[in-house]
Amino acid sequence: MSVYAIVLFLHIVGALGLFVALGIEFLTVSRLRSAQTAEQARDWLSALGPIRVIGPVALITVLLPGLYLAATSTGWQGWNVAGLGAMVVLAGLGAASNATRIPGIGRSIGVLRGPLPLEARLRLRDRLVWSSVIIRIGIALGIVFDMTVKPEVLGALVVLFAFALVAAAAAFVTGRSAQVLATERSAS
């Protein structure tokens, strides 16, 4: 067994861990959007706890072996440079949206009991949080495509942009329930 094989294995395990974290986040955010009581919302918010460990460990386990592989075997090519940039975007989107907004959502639920008031339900359906997780899943799938097909830099960037665009469209279409609630609120 070579060092290359072990490092590649770690790189792939890191990618799997990243998708586990994104899957937990997707499930949690989608369930938060349908929570009817403060207790349900708190239960689902608590499911995000493991992401605080899995996410950073997965990111490091993708990046360090990936950098090693680029430096020792593949060199810097369009697909891995684009993938590295996309990983930075993934981390930035997660930090800018969910890492800042989810704690605020948790605080807004705080001491509430029983059925959620409309204001709290609107916060649980935050379109930025929903869009962020969907777009990050799309970008992550684009990275996997680039790592598999290994296109030149322009092709790699087009793939990443296309995956992000499709994911953004999916987030827009599926995130409309917040608009429905807002309309419901203004009609009351």
Model-derived features: positions:
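Polytopic transmembrane helical bundles with strong interfacial aromatic enrichment
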Residues: M1-S188
